[in-house]
Curated annotation (Swiss-Prot):
Residue runs in coiled coils: none
Principal subcellular localization: cytoplasm
Phenotype reported upon loss of the gene: Swarming motility initiates later than in wild-type; once initiatated the swarming velocity is normal.
Assembly with partners or alone: Homodimer; the beta-strands of each monomer intercalate to form a hydrophobic core, while the alpha-helices form wings that extend away from the core.
Species annotation: Serratia marcescens
Family: Belongs to the CsrA/RsmA family.
Identification of the protein by name: Translational regulator CsrA
An example Gene Ontology biological process: negative regulation of translational initiation
Superkingdom, natural source: Bacteria
Gene encoding the protein: csrA
InterPro entries: CsrA (IPR003751), CsrA_sf (IPR036107)
Length: 69
């Protein structure tokens, strides 16, 4: 894991098209802004895990159930 230190207003680059900017720090929370192309999904980890769990549950449905739902 790469560990970086940034101050408010500073940015880091991921590849050529994704930027992550530190917008603010308040207590133990950090506000960040992510600028990425539309085709790059950006989610908080807990949301990403929920999406993956829903996809897995959908894959377990038999085709007949998918048509009804």
């Amino acid at each position: 894991m790469l560990i970086l230190t940034r101050r408010v207003g500073e940015t880091l680059m991921i590849g050529d098209e994704v930027t992550v900017t530190v917008l603010g720090v308040k207590g133990n929370q950090v506000r960040i802004g992510v600028n990425a192309p539309k085709e790059v999904s950006v989610h908080r980890e807990e949301i990403y895990q929920r999406i993956q769990a829903e996809k897995s549950a959908d894959d377990l449905l038999i085709p007949k159930q998918r048509l009804v739902a």
